[in-house]
Amino acid sequence: MTDSVSVVIPALNEERTVAHVVRACLADEPLEVIVIDADSSDETAAEAQAAGARVLNWREILPEDPRPGKGESLWRGVVAAEGDIVVFIDADLESAAPGMVSALTEPFIDPHIQMVKARYQRSFQGKPTGGGRVTELTAKPLVRQFFPELAHIDQPLGGEYALRRAAAMELPFVEGYGVEAGLLLDVAKR
């Protein structure tokens, strides 16, 4: 793949896990790994920087004050990113591992691909499934009902995914934690 890759890690008080996530992402040698710190009150920024990330406070990126929520961190990360592909990874992903960024970007060899969502197993009621309680009982049934073409998506709410930066610049990023589902639906409608 010849597209350049930026990794954006939104973070708020994730000092315990952010360095691990940064190191896992850097192992795949992206153009850059950016941690967007949403005014953490702990050592998140210092831990991320020590691990090799470029750390930006979300207030530094745009002149307007940030609106509260994860979507704002993600949007500001897109604005700050320089890569053709933007990979989003949650700062608290304890299972982050080398190869994760490459796996999310490989499908972009197809120029028609606009978004790639991670797929991983989480148990629910003692059975391996694609997601936790909210995903299995709410998100996936709603997606199957109203967007059957997306029924194959195991993690519609997951925070690990990649977008072409050009497409991301045209999408609305909602403020709260529904941002992942919103982006998925918006990309599907394009």
What residue ranges belong to the model's regions?
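A short, conserved alpha-helix in the catalytic core of glycosyltransferases
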Residues: 167, 176-190
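The conserved acidic donor/metal-binding loop of glycosyltransferases
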Residues: 90-95
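Short aromatic/hydrophobic "clamp" motif used to bind/position activated sugar donors
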Residues: 86
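Acceptor/aglycone-binding surface of glycosyltransferases and processive sugar-polymer synthases
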Residues: 62-76, 96-167
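Conserved donor nucleotide-binding strand/loop of the catalytic core
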Residues: 31, 45-76, 80
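Short, well-formed alpha-helical segments that are part of the catalytic scaffolds
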Residues: 13-27
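Cell-envelope/extracellular polymer assembly enzymes that use nucleotide-activated donors
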Residues: 4-6, 32, 182, 187
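A conserved acidic beta->alpha catalytic loop
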Residues: 37-46
